[in-house]
Regions:
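A ligand-binding cleft/hinge motif common to bilobed small-molecule-binding domains
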Residues: 82, 98-108, 154-161, 180-198
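Short coil/turn segments
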Residues: 38, 47-48, 100-101, 127-131, ...
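Acidic, polar ligand-binding/catalytic clefts
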Residues: 60, 64, 68, 72-137
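Alpha-to-beta junction loops
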Residues: 31-32, 68-71, 88-97, 141-144, ...
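Short beta-strand-to-loop elements that line the ligand-binding cleft
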Residues: 71-79, 145, 164-174
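N-terminal signal peptide c-region/cleavage motif recognized by signal peptidases
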Residues: 12-15
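Short glycine-rich His-centered loop
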Residues: 29-54
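Ligand-binding cleft/hinge of the Venus flytrap
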Residues: 45-48, 60-71, 113-115, 151-170
């Protein structure tokens, strides 16, 4: 019986926190939404500074639900390193950006994941002249990757599991990692498959 009571109280605390956030949003007059620093199709500011993409549209939908006006939203571009801290500190009200939902994150961050809006997988980009047809052929390769991501962890785990040598070249943003790859600073670039296609 004590266990069930604890779960109910924990649930009540989470509802109270959500109500407190909603009250703060209503008092402020807009939703502060954390988004990716720039990922085509998900969250990217165009040449006029207008944010576009599925993650941005979700932010607009929340604003429409709260205020009846999808324009009552402001965007805070966040790196992978910044995203959870920004949400925990109240810098943003919601986080709508590419974020892998893991059991560790679900249980240790004190945040509520509300659902999945896109399923993705990790991939690699290599130059054709490297002659690589499989990730198993990347032993000893230098790989550009964004730090603080499950992509970085998965990369290390994959190389370790296959007894391969890895030379990670880490960057704060995916844009920086992609640019370094384009400049030839890495043999390969890894991120979500959607990011490779963008």
């Amino acid at each position: 019986m004590k266990r069930m009571l604890f779960l109910v109280l924990l649930g009540a605390a989470q509802v109270a926190a959500a109500q407190s956030t909603l009250e703060a949003v209503r008092a402020r007059g807009f939703v502060q939404c954390g988004v990716n620093t720039g990922l085509a199709g998900f969250s990217l500011a165009d040449s006029k500074g207008v944010w576009r993409g599925i993650d941005v549209d979700l932010c607009r939908a929340v604003a429409a639900a709260v205020f009846g006006d999808a324009r009552k939203v402001r965007y805070t571009p966040l790196t992978a390193q910044q995203r959870f801290t920004a949400l925990q500190s109240g810098e943003v009200d919601i986080l709508s950006r590419n974020t892998t939902w893991t059991i560790t994150r679900d249980t240790s961050l004190g945040l509520n994941f509300v659902g999945v809006n896109y399923y993705d997988g990790q991939g690699f980009m290599v130059r054709k002249d490297l002659g690589v047809a499989s990730a198993l052929e990347l032993n000893g390769a230098s790989v550009c990757v964004q730090t603080g991501t499950t992509t970085e962890k998965n990369l290390a785990d994959y190389f370790r599991a296959n007894n391969m040598e890895l030379k990670s070249v880490v960057f704060e943003t995916n844009e920086q990692a992609r640019q370094a790859y384009d400049e030839g600073r890495c043999d390969a670039y890894t991120t979500d498959a959607s990011g490779l296609a963008a």
